[in-house]
C-alpha cells in the first residue's frame, strides 16, 4: 500500500504563553526587554502564544505584535480573546485565535507576566545562600522558585509543574515537569534526578525540551550540566 503524502494529526507541543496584563505599550516593551535579559538564550527565537484576556479593543494590537516580534519571539497564535473587535484586529494581522483547554497548564513552559516594570539592583550571579527542601509531591500547575538557593525535592514532580532555582536542583523521585537551574545566569549549576521524564530541562537559559533529551537517559538517573556552553548529560549510576 502506498504511503500517504501527507497526514494531519492532533498533537501536543510545549509553548511559552505570554500574558499581557497591562495596556501600556511602552511598559510592555520595557518589561519584555527586562524579562529577556534574565535568560536571553532561553527566549531567543522562542515560539509563543500571546494571551490577551486582559486587553480591551482600544489597544493598538498591530503595535503590540510588532514589539513582541522585535524582541525575537515568533507569535504562533493568540488566546484568551473574548472581544469581537479585538478578535477581528488580531485575525486581520494574520494570527489565529486559539481556544484554551482547561488542562492547558501541562502544555506551558513558563508563564511570564507583564504587570509592572520595577528597577532592581543587579544580583550577584553565584550567590547561593541556603537550600530549600520539599518532601511532598509537586503537582501540575505548581511552581517552586528557590531564590539564591539550591532546591531539593524528595518526591515526584508531575507534568505541568515547574522547579526553578538560582542554584542546583536535586529531584529524588520521578520528574515529569520543567526543571530550570542556574536561573540567575550561573552556568556552574547542575540538575540531578533519579527518574528523568522532564518536559524541559534548563541550565542558565540553555534548555532541552523533552524530545531533545537523549532517549537513553529517559526514565534513568542522570545529571545535567553545561560544558563549553552546551548542555551535557551523564548517568548517575
Curated annotation (Swiss-Prot):
Key words of the record: Cell cycle, Cell division, Septation
Any matching Pfam family: MinC_N
SUPFAM superfamilies: Cell-division inhibitor MinC, C-terminal domain
GO BP term, example: division septum assembly
InterPro entries assigned: CAP/MinC_C (IPR016098), MinC (IPR013033), MinC_C_sf (IPR036145), MinC_N (IPR007874), Septum_form_inhib_MinC_C (IPR005526)
Superkingdom of origin: Bacteria
Homology family: Belongs to the MinC family.
Function: Cell division inhibitor that blocks the formation of polar Z ring septums. Rapidly oscillates between the poles of the cell to destabilize FtsZ filaments that have formed before they mature into polar Z rings. Prevents FtsZ polymerization.
Quaternary structure and partners: Interacts with MinD and FtsZ.
Protein's recorded name: Probable septum site-determining protein MinC
Organism, scientific name: Buchnera aphidicola subsp. Acyrthosiphon pisum (strain APS)
Biological classification of the source: Bacteria, Pseudomonadati, Pseudomonadota, Gammaproteobacteria, Enterobacterales
